Regions:
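TOPRIM fold recognition
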Residues: 56-142
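Phosphate-handling DNA/RNA-contact segment within nucleic-acid enzymes
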Residues: 1-88
C-alpha cells in the first residue's frame, strides 16, 4: 500500500515507508481553491507531504504559518520542476513559498524572487530551525 498524489501530466507521486518515487510522468501538481478562475495567491510547496502538513496546520488555525486568504496550491514534486513551475506562477499576484530550509530550497526561492520580485514571500522563515513544513508539524528540529 502507498499514498499517491496526482500531477498535471497524469502521473503520481507515490510514498510509503519503503518507497518514494513517481509512477508515469513526473510533473507539478496544481490544486485550485475553486474551479474556474485562479486566485490571486498561490502557496508553493516542494513536496506533497509539506502540502498535506500545511492543510493540517490550517485546520488548527496556525496563523503563524498559514495564509488567511483564498489560495491556490502548487506542489513542485521536486525542485527539478522549477522551470515548469515558473510558467504557472506568472498568473499570481502573491507567491507564498513553503520550501525546504536547505540550499536547494533557498536557491529555488531566490530564483523565483529574481523573476517575480516583491510578490514573492519566503514563508520558510516561519519554520526556521526545521528542515521543512512537515518537520515543523511533527516538532522535529534540525
Amino acid at each position: 500500500f502507498a499514498l499517491a498524489f496526482g500531477n498535471i501530466s497524469g502521473g503520481y507521486e507515490v510514498r510509503n515507508p519503503y518507497y518514494k518515487g513517481c509512477i508515469k510522468n513526473k510533473d507539478i501538481s496544481l490544486i485550485p481553491q475553486s474551479r474556474g478562475e485562479a486566485q490571486s495567491r498561490v502557496c508553493l510547496f516542494e513536496g506533497f507531504m509539506d502540502f498535506l502538513s500545511y492543510l493540517t496546520l490550517k485546520q488548527t488555525d496556525d496563523s503563524a504559518i498559514c495564509i488567511n486568504a483564498p489560495c491556490d496550491y502548487l506542489v513542485m514534486n521536486s525542485v527539478s520542476n522549477l522551470k515548469r513551475t515558473l510558467t504557472y506562477l506568472q498568473k499570481y499576484t502573491y507567491i507564498h513559498c513553503y520550501l525546504d530550509n536547505d540550499l536547494a530550497g533557498q536557491k529555488t526561492v531566490e530564483t523565483i524572487a529574481g523573476m517575480y520580485g516583491r510578490c514573492v514571500y519566503n514563508e520558510s522563515n516561519c519554520y526556521a530551525g526545521y528542515k521543512d513544513l512537515n518537520d515543523y508539524l511533527r516538532g522535529k528540529k534540525q
